[in-house]
Amino acid sequence: MGILDAIKLGKEKEVAHAKTVRKLSGLEQAIKQRPPPRDFVGAVAERAGNGTVALIAEIKKASPSKGLIRSDFQVAAIAEAYRDGGAACLSVLTDQTFFQGKPADLELAKAVSGLPVLRKDFMIDPYQVHEARAMGADAILLILAMLDHGQAIELEAAAQAMGMGVLIEIHDEPELERAMAMQSRLIGINNRDLATFAADLTTSERLASKVDRNRIVISESGIGGHGDVIRLMEAGINGFLIGEQLLRARHIESATREIAQARLHACP
């Protein structure tokens, strides 16, 4: 069994249990008490459209491939550092089993940062989309490697019906074809091989050229810093989802600013 299969099996059990604890009607009532979602897609599009870096800065305590990422894990301080460093949006892990995340992390990050926030989790059921909106998320991630096309369309529609943005994550050409048959403008290219966990930036470079011009490419995973960002910008990519590199920095705000202010220099 591969890592995604194991994650999906565990998530199915988790969602089934959650439905017994809190009914969908309860989530719908909570959603009514929330203000409208912040414009996640618009925040990314504004930066990417003028040629500057659209940085989605990620908050996560741990990962399956790297274990504990930051021992001094203070969500509010990290969210503020990301905002002050120039991030366009935040991505917050809410998966407990593999990333040691929780919904309260998302709620806190959104409250202190004032930025649009994406719920980063393994979405397999419309119930989770309602959960995301109830906890205050402005966008969700859909990993096409975990979903058949019907499921992906259903989850995208559920999010859009509540005014949320959707980041569609792909790893290869067949998934890209599926993504371009969906409505969301945001296509995330994950550079990490899900079997080996090795990251290769050529994945983004290769696939970005095949993405329709009306979409916005977000390069994800394995981005080591300013030099990698410049390399990917040279391939026409202006959107980046970065977590580990920033979280391991001694000064998160400065590390964020270095990425957010990266620019291509015009040839004389």
From Swiss-Prot:
Family annotation (Pfam families): IGPS
EC class name: lyase
Q: In which pathway does it act?
A: Amino-acid biosynthesis; L-tryptophan biosynthesis; L-tryptophan from chorismate: step 4/5
Cross-referenced SUPFAM superfamilies, in alphabetical order?
Answer: Ribulose-phoshate binding barrel
EC number in record: 4.1.1.48
- Catalytic reactions on record: 1-(2-carboxyphenylamino)-1-deoxy-D-ribulose 5-phosphate + H(+) = (1S,2R)-1-C-(indol-3-yl)glycerol 3-phosphate + CO2 + H2O
What keywords are annotated for this sequence in UniProt?
Answer: Amino-acid biosynthesis, Aromatic amino acid biosynthesis, Decarboxylase, Lyase, Plasmid, Tryptophan biosynthesis
Q: Which family does it belong to?
A: Belongs to the TrpC family.
- Protein name from the UniProt record: Indole-3-glycerol phosphate synthase 2
Q: What does UniProt list as this organism's lineage? A: Bacteria, Pseudomonadati, Pseudomonadota, Betaproteobacteria, Burkholderiales
